């Protein structure tokens, strides 16, 4: 009979099989009331599942991350329950958990309107408030198939036929008259599912295949309590204000159009930000001793077959042909960098060789997934590739890590989550090679005092990797940086160097990306700063304005002087009221506004205002220039007097 060991090391002995709920009740009624599920020997199970042998048990509550995920999954079933009551002929497809919520794909003979979504949410609340028990039954494959076939649920039948073995016992979850199929676990009672909101609808192909029927996807968010739900909705409201697509239009940074889906038309001010970002990255490349190269954006398909990209990636590659040869427009830079490495004999003395490129890449992303600058088809990678010996891996990874943190800190990103992905089951290379490679990555992180978590088995078949995920001011995660070891590509493309023993050896290749793509990172920065770019990045850093025509000459002189000092400056000599001009340039997020009236002309000074409305008073022009140059040169995130 089972001995249950709890997280604090205490044990409870039973003379019969028990469920997590039984154990929770044994500990106390408060824990039983809070119990959502259990974790038995590391595996999540339903609160009602029986434990027959000795086991380690943790009780899962709404305070746990697992508990919140279970609540969200059960809210997807609640959505199914409600939609079948409102529109009984709906066919249910899949309803998984996603970040911050859930969705359900449904086949419905009407297009859902906003009013429909509101009615659906209302019915969900009505059902949840009944606090009914969710009943789980493990049944045979045949019984599950018969259940859904009798209910006309063709998508569930398809899942059973194509994805579930006939000797398996699927879990059915009964919500009163509604039944759904799932691995689980789910909440034992709907009292846990009161704090949710339906967010939007979208189209989605069954199984993600455009040859299949287009279904309607209903998105929702769910939280453990009302406070957390309201906080999330508030963050969404703030995110909408910061939407880079909206700000990009307001500030005239770029646009997209139907004739070039997923391709960016950079306007002058947006391109200024892009080029300033390039200058910054180049300064770091020089500091960390990288070469900068430029490869062709199109190469023969034969090369992509050698690399393995054609077999595994061809659907995402654009192709063209000329003179009976098929070419691929590059989706990444690495094969081109190996070609550059292969030119001329390399010695161990030439290593490490650090090769960087602002590579123009293209990927055939599905049109439905395109999203402003965040998801595009044409983008510029800031990646680099380091060719080194096995002995040099640790030092080179160390350098990559320092560079990542050096660059992210410039933009004020302080919360960075790091994950180390280790060997998958299918891989190349010996266990000894993987042992050393994984240890090198781990030691490099430890030497930099960086906490990290392992993602066991999540590495690529050709090497382990480190992923850096930064969090913005709204606590949204953006996976940007990677350091990936590659023991495969150099060998596939015949890269080699002459070792100390005069023998030819294959170099290790380190793929390194920091910003990810320039376009996406500018989108992230636009939302992080809400368009209030730090002065060094701002397209226009200073606007000088006159009050009347009599100051026009003085404004032109100052404009030239600031321009000569390397400051991006514009003169506004329009015959408009000064209050109107100030308001307009404030909305354009120009960091500094210099106002010139007769008093300023006489004294040779300027009245200085910031875009945040702060009046810095009258200042000497040379003092303004000196302070601005210092702010720009240091890439400060703060403005004068902040």
Swiss-Prot record:
InterPro entries: aa-tRNA-synt_IIb, aa-tRNA-synth_II, aa-tRNA-synth_II/BPL/LPL, Anticodon-bd, Anticodon-bd_dom_sf, Beta-grasp_dom_sf, TGS, TGS-like. The modification N6-acetyllysine is found at residue 286. It is found in: Cytoplasm. Its EC number is 6.1.1.3. It comes from the Bacteria. Catalyzes the attachment of threonine to tRNA(Thr) in a two-step reaction: L-threonine is first activated by ATP to form Thr-AMP and then transferred to the acceptor end of tRNA(Thr). Also edits incorrectly charged L-seryl-tRNA(Thr). Homodimer. This is Threonine--tRNA ligase. It comes from Escherichia coli O8 (strain IAI1). The lineage of its organism: Bacteria, Pseudomonadati, Pseudomonadota, Gammaproteobacteria, Enterobacterales. The gene is thrS.
């Amino acid at each position: 009979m089972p001995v249950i060991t709890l997280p604090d090391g205490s044990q409870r002995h039973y003379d019969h099989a028990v469920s997590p709920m039984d154990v929770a009740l044994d500990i106390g009624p408060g824990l039983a009331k809070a119990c959502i599920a259990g974790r038995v020997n590391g595996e999540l199970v339903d609160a009602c599942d029986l434990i027959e042998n000795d086991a380690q048990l943790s009780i899962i509550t709404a305070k746990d991350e697992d508990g919140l995920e279970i609540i969200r999954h059960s809210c997807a079933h609640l959505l199914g329950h409600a939609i079948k009551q409102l529109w009984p002929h709906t066919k249910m497809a899949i309803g998984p958990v996603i970040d911050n919520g859930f969705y359900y794909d449904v086949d419905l003979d009407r297009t859902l309107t906003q009013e429909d979504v509101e009615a659906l949410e209302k019915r969900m609340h009505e059902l949840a408030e009944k606090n009914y028990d969710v009943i789980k039954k493990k049944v045979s494959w045949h019984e599950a198939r018969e259940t859904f076939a009798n209910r006309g649920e063709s998508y569930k039948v398809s899942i059973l036929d194509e994805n579930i073995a006939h000797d398996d016992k699927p879990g059915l979850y009964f919500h009163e008259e509604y039944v759904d199929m799932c691995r689980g676990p789910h909440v034992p009672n709907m009292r846990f599912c009161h704090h949710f909101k339906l967010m939007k609808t979208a189209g989605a192909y069954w199984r993600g295949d455009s040859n299949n029927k287009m279904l309607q996807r209903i998105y929702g968010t769910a939280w453990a309590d009302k406070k957390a739900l309201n906080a999330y909705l508030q963050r969404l409201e703030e995110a909408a204000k910061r939407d880079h697509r909206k700000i990009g239009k307001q500030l005239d940074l770029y646009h997209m159009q139907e004739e070039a889906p997923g391709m960016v038309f950079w306007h002058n001010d947006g391109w200024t930000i892009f080029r300033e970002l390039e200058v910054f990255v180049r300064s770091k490349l020089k500091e960390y001793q990288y070469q900068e190269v430029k490869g062709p954006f199109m190469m023969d398909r034969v090369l992509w077959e050698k690399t393995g990209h054609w077999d595994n990636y061809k659907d995402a590659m654009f192709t063209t042909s000329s003179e009976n040869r098929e070419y691929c427009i590059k989706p990444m830079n690495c094969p081109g960098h190996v070609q550059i490495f292969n030119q001329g004999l390399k010695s161990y003395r030439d290593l490490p060789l650090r090769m960087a490129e602002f590579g123009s890449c293209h990927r055939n992303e599905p049109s439905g997934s395109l999203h402003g600058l965040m998801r595009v088809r044409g983008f510029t990678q800031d990646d680099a590739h380091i060719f080194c010996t096995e002995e040099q891996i640790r030092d080179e990874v160390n350098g990559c890590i320092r560079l990542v943190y050096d660059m992210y800190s410039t933009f004020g990103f302080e919360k960075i989550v790091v994950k180390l992905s280790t060997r998958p089951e299918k891989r190349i290379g010996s266990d000894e090679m993987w042992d050393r490679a994984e240890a090198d990555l781990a030691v490099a992180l430890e030497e930099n005092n960086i906490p990290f978590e392992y993602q066991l088995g999540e590495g690529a078949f050709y090497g382990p990797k480190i992923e850096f995920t930064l969090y913005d001011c709204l606590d949204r995660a953006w996976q940007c940086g990677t350091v990936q070891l590659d023991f495969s590509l150099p060998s596939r493309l015949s890269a080699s160097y002459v070792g100390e023993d005069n023998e030819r050896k294959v170099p290790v290749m380190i793929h390194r990306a920091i910003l990810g793509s320039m376009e996406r990172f500018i989108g992230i920065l636009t939302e992080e700063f809400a368009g209030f770019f730090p002065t060094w990045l701002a397209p226009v850093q200073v606007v000088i304005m006159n009050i009347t025509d009599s100051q026009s000459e003085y404004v032109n002189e100052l404009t030239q002087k600031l321009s000569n000092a390397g400051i991006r400056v514009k003169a506004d000599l329009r015959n408009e009221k000064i209050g109107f001009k100030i308001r307009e340039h404030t909305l354009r997020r120009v960091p500094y506004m210099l106002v010139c009236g007769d008093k300023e002309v006489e004294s040779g000074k300027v009245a200085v205002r910031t875009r945040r409305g702060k009046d810095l008073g009258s200042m000497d022009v040379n003092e303004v220039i000196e302070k601005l140059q210092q702010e720009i040169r240091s890439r400060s995130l703060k403005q004068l007097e902040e």
